[in-house]
Amino acid sequence: MGTQNTPPNFRPISRHDGLFKERVHDSYKSKEKPQEPSVCSQCGAVFHEGRWQWLQTPANAHSLQCLACHRIHDHYPAGFLTMKGEFFLAHRDEIMHLVHNHEQLERKEHPLQRIIAEEEKEGATLVTTTDIHLARGIGEALHHAYQGELDFHYNPEQNLLRVTWTH
């Protein structure tokens, strides 16, 4: 089996009747950027210079609901962080302190990254977040500080991340 010689004037014809990959639909993500400046009517975050920030509200700002407040209102998280294991149960208060500190640090720079809720389930704690990056960041911070097992399951169709930390 050798290589085939292609004639010099040969042009491949591509077919246009193939299957196209379906786009991910995230109803919480706007198709367009908000008008500038805009302010969230619930949390006060300001959309300015292409991103959400914590700023003084400009006098001419448009009022809207940011994506984080929308997810919180609908109880529809993008990130799920489950923490479990004997070490977790023995050091729960200290670990939850790290979780909240990490969220506060991220929220200062990224107003849309917030914890929605915390729930105790069968010896584990579930923390839900408004953003997949926050769930991942908290999981990585836990792993860095305490080791243990860290597992990620990303669902691109729903833009959803499940993080499990066990120790």
Predicted regions and their residues:
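Hydrophobic side chains in well-ordered alpha-helices
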Residues: 95, 137-138
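Short cationic amphipathic helices and targeting signals
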Residues: 123-129
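Helix N-cap motif at beta-to-alpha junctions
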Residues: 130-135
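Short Gly/Ser/Thr- and Asp/Glu-enriched loop/turn motifs at secondary-structure junctions
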Residues: 120-122, 158
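A common structural junction motif
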Residues: 143-150
